[in-house]
Regions:
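Juxtamembrane/disordered regions of integral membrane proteins
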Residues: 1-109, 119-129
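Active-site neighborhoods of enzymes that stabilize oxyanions during catalysis
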Residues: 228, 235-249, 257, 261-268, ...
Length: 658
């Protein structure tokens, strides 16, 4: 699927240009009809005004984007919005009654409404997939920046869809919700493969393994390091930086000139945008956003689509309540705005970062898109609005695919996921109380502190906000001291962690039963708990269930096997996790029902990941047919790193280290 390297410049198509011009004129004409104190007498006048604005836009905004202004996101948005209004006022002054605008404020409102109408008309007339103008500007910025690399050595683009399971992708391909990826497979250009994540099936652990080759001692999304009584979280910038420091060994996937876009960890990339572990490097101005601001329509379009996404979420949530859809997640408060930020703003910034990287010829690019994961958590993994988020991602992948024709080197595209998701009503919805409540009432003594909620999407939006304002939040210390807590209970999807802080080391099964006689039995016998991982002083690591136990050192089963409904590799994953320095005193896995394909999260997410059971352990790799996979199954994120880095070395040989 790699295009022959031709260093072709994007060419403007006259008919497409004419149609876009007429669409812009129609949108402006409608906006002037809606907004008071703005008047366009005839459609011909709208055509003239739209031409003037197009010329001014082509002259001014690429210049603003190309010069080295300290472009934070907020400053860039404000500059473009102000220029949009000023260009309308300029058109009013340059024409003889083609348009009349009373003031700057009315001009700004007209520009916003015209953008909203343009978005609708672009979809109706099929002009929303033409990136020719944008690519021409990005290419010009790349050449003038001095960063453009022109070579025949192929590059590789890794596009991660956070939280998408292989069976969900296959059904989306079949049903028309992923047409670009379906076409790649149907034409024989790409193939699909499955891999299995580690016990902690969440982005922090998976990206540590995929991008750095190791995720040792990452037992969950959040965990306690008992020796220092500190809590680590895979979305806190300081903790992500520490996680990267522990695992970076010089063989990161993106070493030697690579680019990280929208990731928790950087893969040792030289170029980063929206990368949580490198927040210090990203504070303030980021030249990576110049491509986005090179076209004024991007800004107004993003604002329009942001509020449209908020409206879509409100209507979808209301429809779910009206139809009494179950399971049903919490979707009120700030969540609609969080969803809109992930599905529109962050997504588009990452796409433009990738397009810029390709036209500059970066050798390796890894970008994470979390909109599907975010919507699925609250709506369900295959609900209509969730699949619509996937369809929009697929549309963006089509843009990236088409941009290869104009890049300064050939590119291969690999699409993968870091984990899947499993669905089901939460533990609290089923029981009326949470895991922390169950633990607290089963203790002999002690107060329980529960931690759950929050995910990598919160981190990404927070990072975007801090970049937007130029604020330096990298030195803020996370509230992670748990030295004054007696018992800490954490939920990471359907994986629970119980830390008994009375000892600064992991307690054995015998110690726990001696000090808290009711705790283990209350947990293992609960109908919505599938297994417990504890360490016995006598028997070593053991998985306990309501009807039996599996002794992991010799794989002996006594009674019913608590891991029977899980992957054949479940015991391997538990043995590995048991060896981590900071594994919890008690690791708790929810039940999994293979008939209904459901489990339950220990946090308030109806579609979840983080543990074992169901589609959360079935992520995918969509790879070029010219690449080869190992003969053995791909188990663990570090194994994926080996595959992806091997493909990069296959393309680039000794151009990368290691």
């Amino acid at each position: 699927m790699t295009p022959e390297q031709r260093l072709v410049r994007p060419k403007i198509k006259p008919l497409r240009l004419l149609l876009s011009w007429l669409v812009a004129a129609a949108a402006l004409f409608v906006a002037a009809w809606i907004v008071p104190h703005v008047e366009i007498q005839t459609f011909l006048g709208a055509v003239v005004v739209s031409l003037i604005i197009a010329v001014l836009n082509a002259l001014i905004l690429p210049l603003v984007a190309a010069i080295r202004l300290p472009l934070t996101l907020v400053l860039g948005f404000l500059i473009v919005l102000i220029l949009d209004a000023l260009m309308l006022l300029a058109a009013s002054g340059l024409t003889d009654n083609a348009i009349e605008v009373d003031s700057f404020g009315w001009a700004l409102l007209t520009a916003l409404i015209a953008s909203a109408v343009t978005v609708v008309l672009d979809v109706l007339f099929g002009t929303n997939d033409d990136d020719t103008y944008t690519l021409r500007v990005i290419e010009r910025i790349a050449r003038r920046s001095g960063e453009r690399i022109e070579t025949e050595v192929p590059g590789i683009v890794f596009l991660e869809i956070d939280g998408l399971a292989l069976p969900v992708l296959q059904r989306a391909m079949r049903d028309g919700n992923a047409p670009n990826m379906a076409r790649w497979v149907a034409e024989g250009d790409h193939r699909l493969a499955e891999w299995e994540p580690d016990l902690s099936s969440q982005t922090g652990a998976s990206q540590a393994g995929i991008l750095h080759g190791s995720n040792e001692n990452t037992p969950a999304f959040r965990w306690v390091e008992k020796a220092t009584a500190t809590m680590m979280t895979c979305s806190a910038p300081a903790d992500c930086a520490e996680l990267e420091r522990r695992h970076a060994t010089g063989v990161g996937l993106l070493t030697d000139g690579g680019a990280s876009r929208g990731n928790l960890l950087s893969g040792e990339a030289d170029h980063v945008i929206l990368t949580v572990s490198r927040m210090e490097a990203e504070k303030g101005a980021n030249p990576g956003y110049r491509a986005f601001f090179s076209n004024g329509f991007n800004v107004t379009r993003v604002l329009v689509l942001f509020f449209w996404e908020v409206f879509l979420e409100w209507t979808a949530a209301s429809r779910a309540i009206r139809r009494d859809v179950r399971p049903r997640g919490h979707r009120s408060g700030l969540y609609p705005f969080m969803r809109a930020a992930m599905c529109v703003v962050v997504r588009d910034l990452i796409v433009y970062g990738v397009l810029s990287d390709m036209l500059k010829g970066r050798p390796a690019i890894y970008a994470t898109f979390s909109s599907y994961d975010e919507v699925a958590h609250h709506s369900g993994l295959e609900r209509a609005d969730t699949l619509e988020a996937l369809r929009k991602l697929d549309q963006q992948f089509g843009r990236i695919d088409r941009a290869r024709t104009y890049s300064s080197r050939p590119y291969e595209i690999v699409v993968l996921s870091d984990h899947g998701q499993t669905q089901g009503a939460t533990f609290k919805q089923r029981n009326g109380y949470g895991l922390e409540d169950l633990v607290e009432r089963s203790l002999a003594s002690g107060d329980v502190t529960g931690f759950s909620g929050g995910d990598e999407q919160n981190a990404m939006v927070g990072l975007a906000v801090s970049e937007a304002t130029g604020a330096d939040t990298s030195k803020k210390k996370p509230k992670n001291d748990v030295s004054d807590r007696q018992v800490v209970v954490m939920g990471s999807g359907n994986l629970g962690l119980v830390y008994l802080m009375e000892e600064r080391r992991r307690m054995t099964l015998e110690e726990i039963e001696g000090r808290h006689p009711a705790l283990i039995s209350a947990l293992r016998e609960h109908p919505h708990v599938g297994w417990l991982l504890v360490r016995s002083e006598k028997d070593g690591p053991v998985a306990l269930g309501g009807g039996g136990a599996r002794y992991l050192e010799d794989d002996r089963v006594d009674g019913e096997d608590p891991l029977a409904n899980l992957s054949p590799n479940a015991a391997h994953h538990l043995r590995r996790t048991d060896g981590f320095a900071d594994v919890a005193d008690i690791m708790v896995g929810s039940f999994y029902d293979p008939q209904l394909d459901e489990g339950c999260a220990f946090e308030e997410l109806i579609s979840f990941h983080g543990g074992m059971g169901g589609l959360q352990t079935r992520p995918f790799i969509l790879y070029p047919a010219s690449f080869t996979l190992p003969d053995e199954p791909i188990v663990g994120a570090a194994a994926v790193h080996g595959v992806l880095r091997g493909w990069r070395q296959q393309l680039q040989g000794d151009k990368i280290a290691g």
